[in-house]
């Protein structure tokens, strides 16, 4: 039997008794990073006085999926008590476990997903922004045109948007939002359920000022409210050119939505 097991996103007390029971019985653990999972098991054994001791560990991530499924004996997923554990939170949400779900479905392997901690739902509940519909984008592309387009799509969404972001890029994300829509309401939370959990909610411009004087360490979850203009359409280069703004500022805005070099755009505008 194959179980998909959610792990705490910070606070060990958030793991359920059912998850602990399955962990104690499991023979095989599949996970993204075996070091992270082994460390978690050590902590759980110490905290709850357990004897979690799976016989085998296997790593499954985006770089070894094909090799893993080519070599792993699928019969063992049916005859052994197997667990797929995420590094933190719910499996298969911005997580390579999704490929194992598909594999189980394609091969008629029974599986069960246990309930547990989930960072995006915690952020949704804490935001005061989301009531029903929302869009979850996971992690955005890191650089260039793809990232600029992804941010613009998020701002043009008909629904509030939830994004995962790293401490290295959280400031640039809020800066990009403030440049396109300074008054857009944004909620952000880091280190959720941990000792140094921190939450902020403000307009994008004011939030940027707050963050410039804050400790940015930790993984962030960002909730962007939908635009106050429900009929908002995608901003185009033509829209920006029609604005009463200095050419340098126009060049920067065009760069944000196209991913092209701002200096090159500016040179084209003045020639």
From Swiss-Prot:
Pfam families: TP_methylase (PF00590). It comes from the Bacteria. One of its GO terms (molecular function) is rRNA (cytosine-2'-O-)-methyltransferase activity. PROSITE patterns: RSMI. Keywords: Cytoplasm, Methyltransferase, rRNA processing, S-adenosyl-L-methionine, Transferase. It is an enzyme of class 2 (transferase). It is found in: Cytoplasm. Belongs to the methyltransferase superfamily. RsmI family. SUPFAM superfamilies: Tetrapyrrole methylase. Catalyzes the 2'-O-methylation of the ribose of cytidine 1402 (C1402) in 16S rRNA. The keyword Coiled coil does not apply. The gene is rsmI. GO terms for cellular component: cytoplasm. The keyword Methyltransferase applies. It catalyses: cytidine(1402) in 16S rRNA + S-adenosyl-L-methionine = 2'-O-methylcytidine(1402) in 16S rRNA + S-adenosyl-L-homocysteine + H(+). This is Ribosomal RNA small subunit methyltransferase I. Its main location: cytoplasm. Its EC number is 2.1.1.198.
